Amino acid sequence: MLAASFSGPVVHEVAQADPQLATPQHKVRFAVCGMSHDHIYGMVGAIQRGGGELVLAQATEPDKVAAFKKRFPDVRWAANEEEVLHDSSIQLVLSSKIASERAPLGVRVMRSGKDFLSDKPGITTLEQLAEVRKAIAETKRIYGIMYSERLEVKAAVKAGELIHAGAIGRVIQTINIAPHQIHQGAGDWGGASGRPDWFWNDTQYGGILCDIGSHQVDQFLYYTRSTQAEVVASQIANVAHKDHPHF
């Protein structure tokens, strides 16, 4: 980040992240509907830390279901999506389905009277964006997207706090370099296996700028306190994976 108030020598300091709230301030009953990406574990953890109670889960991939059951052995399982949507006791639905399927699910969730939290990218086409905006306007429900790089990384959270407190002056430029491994390491925000077939298809995962670049756009807007942005140039290339022409 480049700030507009540099003066004097640079002083190296360690900024401590604020401790997490010991007691959640809110309570919410939530469900998981679709877990194609392992980001779902970090999403569940974030909601639980905020006072959420995981009461229901639904997914179709056997390996993902087995892993989730091992992590959350007491959760109740729904037979299908409709069971989740028709459960009036649920206030919020989380999903890390295949990226192109998240927005349509979110629209159905909102129209069932529930709020929705999607893994990123939460929307993959302009047509989906229009449908989501329409559903929000008509239902007054929340369509949230978990941008974990800003919301779950302690350094990023602290950076936001310092910026908004005026500690480094006005941010006038942001630069972000975000390499992404093909085979991700273990962890709630990464995943412990290679990319599934859908992750090589740009119509399903949204393309690299939508998938990864959405993180950076979110951060650029937040750190500069902007509400609008214009993309003036972009470039992509498939350098090392010619066997996946739609990557």
Where are these regions (language model features)?
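Short, conserved SAM-binding/catalytic segment
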Residues: F68-V75, V132-I136
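Predominantly a Rossmann-like dinucleotide-binding segment in NAD(P)-dependent oxidoreductases
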Residues: D38, I142, L151-H244
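Short acidic low-complexity segments
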Residues: R76-H86
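Short, Asp-centered acidic motifs that coordinate Mg2+ and/or phosphate
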Residues: L56, Q91-L92, G144, Q173
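N-terminal Rossmann-like dinucleotide-binding module
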Residues: L2-F72, A192
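Short loop/edge segments at beta-strand edges and connector loops
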Residues: A79, S118, I145-Y147, A233-I236
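Beta-strand-loop-alpha-helix segment that lines the small-molecule cofactor/substrate pocket
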Residues: L92, I98, A103-L151, G166
